[in-house]
Each structure stands twice: as C-alpha cells, then as structure tokens.
C-alpha cells in the first residue's frame, strides 16, 4: 500500500516509517526537518521536505497515496499557530485526500483533548472538557481535528479515524516531566510524585499494530484509545531511580496535598475495550515485557540527561 506519514521525523514517526517499509509498503514521509528526512532514507521510503501548512506541498504529498498516517503537529504554545498550521494544515490534508481518492486517514489524537479525567478507566465516550485541560489551546485544536475527521468521514468515502494516545514510547522516551524526575534523582537524591496517579503508556509497535488493524477493518469516523501498559508515577519513578541513582528514594505525596504539575495528578487509565472489540486490537507485550522495554527507553533518556548535567 502507498502510505503517507506526516511528521515522520518525530518521536513516533521514525519507528512507524521503518516498520511499514520493512513490511513492503511504499512510504512517503512529509516533514519540514530536512536532516531528519535524510536519516529516514531507506528502500521503500520517499521523502518530501515541507510544512503541513503549505497547501501546494500537501497536495503533492498526497498524490498516489492510498492511506495517510497523520503525526505532524507544531506543538506551538501560540493559539494562532495551532489554528494556522495544525488545523488549517489538517484541512488541506483532508481536501487533498478527497481529491486524490485516498482510502484511509489515521489521525494521531491525544488524551489532552479529553480535558480532565472524570472517571477511571477513561473510554472514548468521555466528555471533552477543554477548559480544564492542562493545555486548553492544544486540546481544542486536537478536538477540532477529531471533529473535522468525523465530518469528512461521513461526507466522503474515506475511512477517517483518530487514535487517542496518552504517552507513547519506543526505544526512547521523552517529555519534560520524565527528564525532570531523572534530574531530581541525580541532583536531589529523591523523586517526589503524587500517589496513586499514572497513565496508560503505548509502545510504538502496539501503535503500529493498531494502525494496521484500522486499515484492515475500515471503520469510519471513530475514536480508538490504544494502550500497552498502565503504570503509576511511583512505579515509573522507581524505574528511573534504579537506573539513574540507586541511592535515591521515591516519595509519594497524597494527591490532595500535591503542589506540582497537574499533569501528574490526572490519572489516565485508558479503557481499550472498544479497540479490542471492533479492531481485534491486543497488545503484543506482557506487562513484564512492556516494563522491560520501557526500562530500555528510560535508560537512553537517563544517559541523555546525565550528559547534559
């Protein structure tokens, strides 16, 4: 299948491109990171340097494609950028898909668009409480892409769906909060986290499996939560301590007394029963295997933080 991956040079894109190409798909990558595109060059992969907000570039990228995996995002804190780059860019992508008779679009969504978790586990019927999201502008822009996809899915013969992600990881894992915990273990000898809070981590090969199941089943206008393993911040912090500084300790503060980032107190345990029921999705990893893989990703992050200290 001819597949376009937007944002293919990002944290998720590299692994997605690699696996799809190895499985025999013809992959085209659209990204503005010229150096990153060079690193992705391999048999079966075509690269195109450009921005999602450039309509002419998007039209060129979509030509002859049968499926699109949309990972591109500006991550700007400026609401105008989110509208002008991300929302408008997604509209360009949708319109180009219609014009080129694309069969599938899979949009990478985020738990942030759910706002604030009102229950546990969180399923796809959870309300989108944008005003209470940790990044309301980001959440709103992501929600707009979800809804645009639904509109186009029912107006045109394209299977457009959104995959909801809380925290994805592959051979590496990033994020300022994890880096902050590593730094605290190294410099303060302790990591302080809220008790009984955490989230559903998604291993990238499971994400790719979910994408492939969507391509096979062909639902339209749906949201799908995907997850590999749920971990509390206490568990993750202990994994960091074991690698960064075994003499450090983990301190769990009751949630009601927590004064740090609200991101850490929102408990994002994903209900993935919809994906299991409709797609036949299932994580390929046992809990022990998922934790071991995450430990490897954390090891790379620890090395990065140590080198910067």
Give residue spans per PLM region.
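N-terminal Rossmann NAD(P)H-binding glycine-rich loop of SDR-like oxidoreductase domains
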Residues: 3-23
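NAD(P)H-binding glycine-rich loop region in Rossmannoid oxidoreductase-like domains
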Residues: 49-88
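Conserved Rossmann-fold NAD(P)-dependent oxidoreductase catalytic core, especially the SDR/UDP-sugar
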Residues: 92-137
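Conserved beta-loop-beta element that borders a ligand/cofactor-binding pocket
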Residues: 110, 146-171
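A conserved pocket-lining segment of Rossmann-fold NAD(P)-dependent short-chain dehydrogenase/reductase
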Residues: 128-133, 160-166, 180-202
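Glycine/proline-rich active-site loop of Rossmann-fold NAD(P)-dependent oxidoreductases
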Residues: 143, 156, 168-179, 188, ...
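Mid/C-terminal beta-alpha module of Rossmann-like enzyme folds, strongest
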Residues: 185, 210-213, 217-259, 305-306
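Amphipathic terminal alpha-helices
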Residues: 286-309
